[in-house]
UniProtKB/Swiss-Prot annotation:
Binds 2 magnesium or manganese ions per subunit. This is D-alanine--D-alanine ligase. Cell wall formation. InterPro entries: ATP-grasp, ATP_grasp_subdomain_1, D-Ala_lig_Van_CS, D_ala_D_ala, Dala_Dala_lig_C, Dala_Dala_lig_N, PreATP-grasp_dom_sf. ATP binds at residues 167-222. Pathway: Cell wall biogenesis; peptidoglycan biosynthesis. Mg(2+) 1 binds at residues 296, 307. Residues 139-336 form the ATP-grasp domain. One of its GO terms (biological process) is peptidoglycan biosynthetic process. Mg(2+) 2 binds at residues 307, 309. It is found in: Cytoplasm.
Length: 361
C-alpha cells in the first residue's frame, strides 16, 4: 500500500483555501488503496503531521494545533522516498499529493524540490507550474500561439508612464490584479484614475507585479482538463456572477450558497461548447500541463482564455462530478498520472570518468 502524503498550507495568502481543499481530499481519498499522511506547512514554514490535521477545527487556533499535531523535526530522502522524522518516530512518503494554492507550493517551488529529490508528485511539473502561476507569462505565451487573451498591460515599476499607457491602450473600465495570485485575491474593477491608483496600491500588498486587463462584458465559463498522455475534458461550468467579475467574497463568503453560483452544464449551444473544449485542450498542451487543471474563459466577441489554475480549489470536483467522476476517482487519476510521469523520466546522469582526465594548461 502506497504512503500518500497530502501536503497543504505553506506561506501563501491562499493558505486557508488550501486547508479547505486538503480537508476535502482527506475525506474523499480511498483509504483501502492508500495509507494517508496529512502534512501541513504553517505560514512560518514549519511542518506538522498527525491525525488531528484531518479536522478543520484544528486550524482555528494555531496554538492548539502546535500542541496537538506532531512537529516534523527533519526529513531526508532515500530510494525516491521522503523520510519524515518527528521525535523518535519516522514516516516514509512514497508519493507527494500537492494541495497548495498560490505561492510557495502551487508555483513550482515544491515541485522543484520533488524533482531534485526524485520523489513522484501530483499535478503539473515544476516548469509548467512556475510559468502558469504568472498570469503575464501565460498570456504572452498563449498570445504567441494565437490563443485569444484579453488586451493587457503589466509592470513591476509603478509610475505615471504606466498609468497613462494603460489609459491609452486599454481605457476605462479596467481589471487590476496581482500577476501571481489566485482565488480572485486583490482583484479590482476600476473606472477612473483614482480607482486605478487605489487598486494598484492594493495589488502591491500581495505582489510586486501588476497586471491590468481591458474589462469586457463577458460570460465566465470554466473547464477542467485532466491528463498526462491521454487528456480528458470536463463538462463546462458557467459562473452566475452577481458582480462584474467573480470576486473573492462571492467565491468563499456567500453563506448557504456553496455552489449556487456554478451552473453545470453551462447554458451554451453545442457548437460553442465544442470550441471551448478544443481550446482548453490546446491550452493544456501548449502550457505542458499534466494532472488536473482548471482553465477559465471569458466569452464575448471571441473565446478568451482568462486564467489557468494548476491546483484548482476543491480540485474542481464539482465540475468533474457532472462529467461522471467521483472525488476519489479524481484523486486516483492524479496519483496514477504522477506515478506514470515519474516512470517516464529520462535518464539524467551517465557514468563518466571525465574528472580523471588531465587537462593541460
Amino acid at each position: 500500500m502506497l504512503n500518500i502524503g497530502i501536503f497543504f498550507g505553506s506561506k501563501s495568502v491562499e493558505h486557508e483555501i488550501s486547508i479547505i481543499t486538503a480537508q476535502q481530499v482527506l475525506s474523499s481519498i480511498d483509504r483501502k488503496k492508500y495509507n494517508v499522511i496529512p502534512i501541513y506547512i504553517s505560514k512560518s514554514g514549519e511542518w506538522f503531521t498527525g491525525k488531528v490535521l484531518e479536522d478543520l477545527e484544528t486550524f482555528k487556533d494555531f496554538d492548539k494545533l502546535e500542541k496537538k499535531a506532531k512537529k516534523i523535526d527533519s526529513f531526508s530522502v532515500k530510494n525516491n522516498k521522503l523520510l519524515l522524522k518527528y521525535g523518535l518516530k519516522k514516516q516514509t512518503i512514497d508519493f507527494c499529493f500537492l494541495v497548495f494554492h498560490g505561492t510557495n507550493g502551487e508555483d513550482g517551488t515544491f515541485q522543484g524540490m520533488c524533482e531534485i529529490f526524485g520523489i513522484p508528485y501530483s499535478g503539473c511539473n515544476h516548469f509548467s507550474s512556475a510559468f502558469t502561476m504568472d498570469k503575464v507569462v501565460t498570456k504572452l505565451l498563449l498570445k504567441e500561439k494565437e490563443i485569444s487573451v484579453v488586451d493587457f498591460e503589466y509592470t513591476t515599476e509603478i509610475n505615471e508612464e504606466f498609468f497613462k499607457r494603460c489609459e491609452k491602450n486599454l481605457g476605462y473600465p479596467m481589471i487590476v490584479k496581482p500577476a501571481r495570485l489566485g482565488s480572485s485575491i486583490g482583484v479590482s474593477k476600476v473606472v477612473d484614475r483614482k480607482n486605478f491608483e487605489e487598486a494598484v496600491k492594493n495589488v502591491l500588498l500581495f505582489d510586486n507585479k501588476v497586471l491590468v486587463e481591458k474589462w469586457i462584458n463577458a460570460r465566465e465559463i470554466n473547464c477542467a482538463v485532466m491528463g498526462y498522455k491521454n487528456i480528458f475534458v470536463s463538462e463546462l461550468e458557467e459562473i452566475n456572477k452577481k458582480n462584474d467579475f467573480f470576486n473573492f467574497e462571492e467565491k468563499y463568503f456567500k453563506k448557504g450558497k456553496k455552489f449556487s453560483n456554478h451552473i453545470i452544464p453551462a447554458r451554451i449551444d453545442e457548437n460553442l461548447k465544442n470550441k471551448i473544449k478544443e481550446i482548453a485542450k490546446d491550452t493544456f498542451k501548449i502550457l505542458e500541463c499534466s494532472g488536473n487543471v482548471r482553465i477559465d474563459f471569458l466569452i464575448a466577441d471571441k473565446i478568451y482564455v482568462n486564467e489557468i489554475n494548476t491546483i484548482p480549489g476543491a480540485l474542481s470536483f464539482y465540475i468533474w462530478q457532472k462529467s461522471g467522476f467521483t472525488f476519489s476517482q479524481i484523486i486516483d487519476n492524479m496519483i496514477n498520472m504522477g506515478l506514470e510521469r515519474f516512470k517516464d523520466k529520462k535518464i539524467v546522469s551517465i557514468d563518466t570518468n571525465i574528472l580523471k582526465i588531465k587537462v593541460g594548461k
